Amino acid sequence: MSGDLWFLDASAFLKLLLNEPESAELERWRVGRRLASSDLLRTEARRGVAHMEASVLRSCDELLAGIQKVRLTPALLDRAGRIPGRGLRTLDAIYVTSALQLRDDLADFVSYDRRQLAAAERLG
């Protein structure tokens, strides 16, 4: 990975949105960086804050608007389903496969899920 896009999964995105232990450090880190994610983030992030105040929902939409998204296509979903091995959950496989679509443009993959990070590293 040698580009300038930083790929976020939902665990990292929600830490940017909510007040969690890693949030302040992650917020400082993201300043000036170009962010990307899967189209899946649109649903997963909104589901993660659906029970919260309207202001949090608005902040979620504003933050989502500034992130480049990889479209979910049948081919991408098929590739995600074919990742070898056990232990990688379905949504995590979709994030990893989405990141692989941007491989040449990526600086790194940001997640707080160890299994997902291991799969992303293993697959390149």
Predicted regions and their residues:
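Active-site neighborhoods of divalent-metal-dependent phosphate/nucleic-acid chemistry enzymes
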Residues: 69-121
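A generic structural signal for short hydrophobic patches within well-formed alpha-helices
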Residues: 13-14, 42, 116-117
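Short active-site oxyanion
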Residues: 2-4, 32-35, 65-68, 103-108
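Short, well-structured N-terminal submotif of metal-dependent ribonuclease cores
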Residues: 1-37, 49-60
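Short, contiguous hydrophobic alpha-helices characteristic of membrane insertion segments
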Residues: 14-20, 68-70, 124
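A general structural signal for well-ordered alpha-helical segments in protein cores
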Residues: 23, 42, 57-60, 77, ...
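Anionic, Ser/Thr-rich low-complexity intrinsically disordered regions
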Residues: 35, 51, 58-62, 66-69, ...
